[in-house]
């Protein structure tokens, strides 16, 4: 009897250990199943985020780079109907569900930019600074001209940094100061004389400043400016274009809309703003309004350039027309 009471604690200890192992095994199995379930749910959620997009119906996959969605999916998890973007004008650089491609960037020569890599269906245009221009910001919307050194160069101008110039010594500074003091009076005289001459020419009026006949003057007021819009935009800054169209009837809402449609492309913003102004103004007297607006903004050189180009085109068209009439008369 005493032997039984001695063995009883050992038996109870073994039973407790066995029950503990069973419980731990069940808990481990439950945790393992819970982990697998969470893994499946995570996989499904990831698939939903990466491969599905709700727009009408669930499309299984996005359109690849260089293409856009032609129409919405009609059946859940159907393959989308994708069509290529317009080569050289539009692109998409990653998979997406949009029905539109992005417009290619334009490198604005007026801001010192040129094309480094042309736009393709899968890659936007890459711009760089023109020779003798630089840009030291992360995103370049315009490049600045390199400084020209008068007294020697320490570091040459690069695409990302301006020229570093040597400084002039104090004796040279004193010499230049004396020369400058001697030159100031004649320079002031010449400037004043030119300003007075220019003022007199401007007050002469259009009939005295041009030799065009009345027929040509009438045609100038009705000239079609649409083919000159790009040239005009290239000679103006974005702020100058906005100020001009704002003063000539384009609403702030339209200006903001064009800005938002072309956030990264200032050259396209200028072109679209001028085209919108021209559509609102129509052809009648648009040329005169433009020339006066450019002169008011201090862009007299650009105004004269555009005026000369238009007159040249009109003269050429008139000569061709007269030649054709003479040929018909001879026949």
Curated annotation (Swiss-Prot):
Region entry Interaction with HIPK3, spans:
209-313
Q: In the record, what terms sit under GO molecular function?
A: calmodulin binding; tumor necrosis factor receptor activity
Modifications the protein undergoes after translation, according to the UniProt entry: Palmitoylated. Palmitoylation by ZDHHC7 prevents the lysosomal degradation of FAS regulating its expression at the plasma membrane.
Q: Which CDD domains match?
A: Death_FAS_TNFRSF6, TNFRSF6
Where are its TM segments located? Answer: 172-192
Note the SS bond partners: 59-73, 63-82, 85-101, 104-119, 107-127, 129-143, 146-157, 149-165
Biological process annotations from GO = activation-induced cell death of T cells; extrinsic apoptotic signaling pathway in absence of ligand; immune response; motor neuron apoptotic process; necroptotic signaling pathway; negative regulation of apoptotic process; regulation of stress-activated MAPK cascade
Known Pfam families for this protein? Death, TNFR_c6
Share the domain note from the entry. Contains a death domain involved in the binding of FADD, and maybe to other cytosolic adapter proteins.
The name on file for this protein is Tumor necrosis factor receptor superfamily member 6
The species this protein belongs to is Cercocebus atys (Sooty mangabey)
Q: Lineage, please?
A: Eukaryota, Metazoa, Chordata, Craniata, Vertebrata
